[in-house]
Each structure stands twice: as structure tokens, then as C-alpha cells.
Amino acid sequence: EIGVRLVGSEMCIRDSENELCFPFRRYAIGKVYRGERAQRGRFREFYQADIDIIGDGKLSVVNEAEIPSIIYKVFSEFGLKRFCISVNNRKILNGFYAMLGLTEKSGDIMRTVDKIEKIGPDLVRAILVDDYAIEGEKADEILAFIGIKGTNEEVLASLEKYRGRNEMFDQGLDELTTVAKYLGAFGVPQENFAVDLTIARGLDYYTGTVYETTLLDHPEIGSVCSGGRYDNLAEYYPVSYTHL
């Protein structure tokens, strides 16, 4: 039989879960494959560098700051200076959409918002209203929320105004604040990371912190190093795993 190496970091623990010490850190570079429609910038066969931290049912939020700190160190070693690691938390987004009574549509909203850099806010609004039957006023609230800008401290301070209205939102805000704090402690300069509420990542399995890295002098390339936390590896294995 012949097989191909699939995209999916969970594959690394499939056959050796009883031999690992957690949290397990893994780094790998190799050719991988995924089944999707080939298009510009999206390939079925490509090389990928993986950075993984896997916990046995629990993983500290501090580890969520460890990943972007590694991204910073790698890019710095490459001699790159003008890059930005954008950071957000899916719990903040899910909590905010719950405040608007849009829990059932949160996945559709996040997949649409995730395209805002490519298609612009006007088209994002049109899709929310026309395709997902979201009221225009609520669509405007969504755009205003994800459009909150400023320094990292200013964005986090703006989010504090929503505290107390949704438990998931509050948890996500606590986590994002902790991640921002530890990024500084891990030596990542303020100019190299940004709290950005437009970052959602299009895949539904992300549950916590999400990241996207862009080269500031080459925005046309798009994201060059992305990922996030997900807690659903129990769907694939008999043991509960938390994964970054």
C-alpha cells in the first residue's frame, strides 16, 4: 500500500502516545499533502515547518505565548526585522457574537471576517447581511468591534468595556491579556506583535489563541506562519489532548 504524509500535527502522536512526556514539544520540516482545490497560494503538495506543543488534557495559556515567541526567534535568526505576529483569541470572538445573539452563525461570521484583508470591510458586510441574513445593525457592530485599533494596551483596554456580559468573552480576554504579557516577558518587542481582532483563522477547530504572521514589506504574500490552539484532539484519540 502507498500513502502520503498528511497535513495535521496530531499525526505525530498517533503511534507513540504512551512514550511521550507532556507537554510534548515537536518541531519538524517536511513535505506534506492536503486534499483541496489547487489555486494561487494554495497547494496540494508543499513543504511545511511545524511547531507543536501538545498537552495531555491541559495546557497552560503561557504555552500559547511560547509559540509566537518561537516564531519571533526564527524570523529574527533569518535576518528579518519587519514582520508582525497578529494575535487574537477565538473565545473573544465567540463570546462577542453570543452577545449579539449570533452563536449559531459564529462560524460563518469568523470565516467571512477572516477574509477581510483580501475582500475589504464593505464586501464582508454584504456577505454577512445577504448570505447569512444578519441584520445590518449587527453587521455594523461586528465591523466596529473587529476594527478596534491602537497599541496592544489600548486594544485590550477597549475590550475591557465588554467584560461581564459573556463568560466565554471574559475568559478569552483573560487569556489574550496573559499571552500579551508573556510575549513581552519572552523578549518579543511590541513592534513585532499586535492584538488584532480581525484574526480568526478559517478552520472551526481552533478554540483559543490564534496567530498569523505577515512580512510588512510584502503584504501581498499574506500569512507566512499561522496557527493556534485547539482542544479537540479527543475526537481522534481515546485520550484527551490539548494542542498548539
Predicted stretch roles:
Residues 1, 5, 25-28:
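Short, conserved beta-strand segments within well-ordered enzyme catalytic domains
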Residues 2-13, 243:
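Single conserved hydrophobic/aromatic residue that forms the stacking wall/gate
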Residues 14-81, 91, 127-244:
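Positively charged, Gly/Ser-enriched RNA/tRNA-binding surfaces
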Residues 85-87:
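Short internal beta-strands
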Residues 99-101, 209:
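Short low-complexity, flexible loop/linker segments enriched in glycine and/or proline
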Residues 102-122, 215:
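Acidic, His- and aromatic-enriched active-site or binding-groove loops in soluble protein domains
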